[in-house]
Amino acid sequence: MIPGQMLKGNLEDCVLIIISMKEAYGYEIVQKLEEFGFGSIAEGTVYPLLLRLEKQGFVVTEMRASEHGPKRKYYRITPEGKKEILSFIASFRELAEAVENLMLEVAKNEQTD
């Protein structure tokens, strides 16, 4: 499981990526996060995050009827949301490369000790 502190700064953009793949409602997004290996993330964590994404203009919402109960709020990515994803991916790749370089250096030093 991914430690919460590592997720903290990235979860919002990961949710945005999930929404970019397919319009989705809150609980569906929580399920997708679990499917992708993020572990069990509480809906109480995801809903405020979705509200922030909406306020930032990265997603728009639409209420739709559900076959299984009350209406559901579906989230759809906006052009601004797509730009945010591209920015996140570029930044994350940079970070991943720096961490990889650091880990390689540690491994190299362990071999010489």
What spans do the regions from the language model cover?
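Short beta-strand/turn micro-motifs at beta-sheet edges
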Residues: 1-5, 62-64
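N-terminal helix-turn-helix DNA-binding core of bacterial DNA-binding proteins
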Residues: 3-47
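A cross-family signal for key residues in well-ordered alpha-helices
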Residues: 17, 31, 51, 60, ...
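Short, hydrophobic-biased segments on the C-terminal half of alpha helices
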Residues: 47-54
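Beta-hairpin "wing" of winged helix-turn-helix
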Residues: 56-71, 76
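Basic, amphipathic "hinge/linker" alpha-helix immediately C-terminal to the N-terminal HTH DNA-binding motif
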Residues: 71-89
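Amphipathic alpha-helical dimerization/coiled-coil segments
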Residues: 83-113
